[in-house]
């Protein structure tokens, strides 16, 4: 389907009978309209050709071989525009055989049939709109009971029989016995309604705006009543209010999409294109057919039987007609969703038939396996591992995957640089893994983004673009900040990598899909690139420190050994009695850590700017140390003040660790970079 902006899209919803017939009908030169499948046959057992008006009819679905009709005549497609496009004898159109992948047919049902998705799936849309119990509607659909039509001021059979109830449970055993087929049909059309036709009438009589108004009034009345004091009654009222909300939302959706509720009852049943339900000949001359073909045959057999009962048979009891309508309803239910809330239908080998729902739903369905998860060229797959040294917009590709994905680009580069005279020599250089191959691969990857996808792709952040870099190993390296968008972790998850080929795809990847341009959740607007899992553990370990305060050196001999026999430049830091290091800048502390003179979690004193905010006004020093020159140090829980003889503050030291310093510097650099970028943008 193509919308007004020329975008290809797929829309799933209910359609009108007119739209179904428009999809299938074709007008032949003699004025005959074809498109309706009336016979349950597939191929003739002698000629091995599709049966006319059957499930594989060439008049309805197109020729099996391009440009060849059922008679065997051949015509070049599009060569002679003046000649008729249809064969005059068999009525087959001269067209490409690929039309059998999308040309549909239809079955004209002899009675209305309820779509099982809207009736039996929970929540039931039909039950919600009609505000009736699902069990009652199922009994009505499967002809277990009926309801009387309101006919005012007219004598009716039901009045004569004294049956004035709205729902008549006893019709199945009494009323049909009085009529033949035509008589019962007349009686039913005039006085009672049953089957899917009754559902269709009630849906057609609905005014959705009145449904919304009545539901809203009832919801407000229930809300004004308040609590009854009975827990069971309160729960019942709560469930009723939830139901009314769902009913209003459903009615609004029908109004917004301009869909008529009676479309949930089928009069025409679409028939899938033959290529989507093939019959394949295997070794030994045996045929292997899709289960959907057998289910379609079952529907056509029962529908044709019902048609014959309604048209030709004049003495058949009305009860038999009702039973046949029930069989048609069950056959269509099995075709659309086999076994929904019941026992599934099985073949002779006790194997469950795969219905239309089974074909499209689930991990192995048409959408997830064939359309979304199918194998494509220029793609690869591997396990993901954390890449902490990567930028947010980069990903690490293993050499083995990268050379396969970009092989055609590398071959073109080798030929352009006159390093290979033809494709064969270029491929041999790639197989031998010559150094020049990796250089050209690096150049190609610098200007070509890749797409990473993690199944299931439930929202748009399931596919993001990255700038690839070569890494060793066989796993894809990923920045941990992008894991939340993919719903990925590093416990064995796999991701697929794709190469956008066209210029439009590359432009879309760069402008819309790069990971650093998708920092907010499209659903709620919250930041989605937040530290999770490995990053949180790393930040915890980095800033864990030692929680024993200033007494750590005095009572932990293991830490004291870290400083024994260490000679340190007095310009960088000096020792106290407990050998607790003093640093005059964060650079000195990080340098000492890189030289392995201190460990990551070792408490240290870092000189801080004279900021009075770090000093608690009511805090009492834990210890005061006096120097020989009259200066002294006031030691608190997390900071230290050096005062002069006149009690003036000379300097302040804060208690920290190398891990805290590293974390603080990373945040500071990030904030400064953001401020610079913001100032440039404004």
From Swiss-Prot:
Q: Where does Zn(2+) bind?
A: 69, 71, 87, 90
Instruction: Please name the GO terms that the record assigns under molecular function.
Output: DNA binding; DNA-directed RNA polymerase activity; magnesium ion binding; zinc ion binding
UniProt entry keywords in alphabetical sequence: Chloroplast, DNA-directed RNA polymerase, Magnesium, Metal-binding, Nucleotidyltransferase, Plastid, Transcription, Transferase, Zinc
Catalytic reactions on record? RNA(n) + a ribonucleoside 5'-triphosphate = RNA(n+1) + diphosphate
Q: Which InterPro entries match?
A: DNA-dir_RpoC_beta_prime, RNA_pol_asu, RNA_pol_N, RNA_pol_Rpb1_1, RNA_pol_Rpb1_3, RNA_pol_Rpb1_3_sf, RNA_pol_Rpb1_clamp_domain, RNApol_RpoC1
Per the record, GO CC terms? chloroplast; DNA-directed RNA polymerase complex; mitochondrion
The protein's Enzyme Commission number: 2.7.7.6
Q: How is the cofactor bound?
A: Binds 1 Mg(2+) ion per subunit.
Q: What Pfam families does the record tag this protein with?
A: RNA_pol_Rpb1_1, RNA_pol_Rpb1_2, RNA_pol_Rpb1_3
Q: State the protein's purpose.
A: DNA-dependent RNA polymerase catalyzes the transcription of DNA into RNA using the four ribonucleoside triphosphates as substrates.
Task: Summarize subunit and interaction data from the UniProt record for this chain.
Answer: In plastids the minimal PEP RNA polymerase catalytic core is composed of four subunits: alpha, beta, beta', and beta''. When a (nuclear-encoded) sigma factor is associated with the core the holoenzyme is formed, which can initiate transcription.
Name the record gives this protein: DNA-directed RNA polymerase subunit beta'
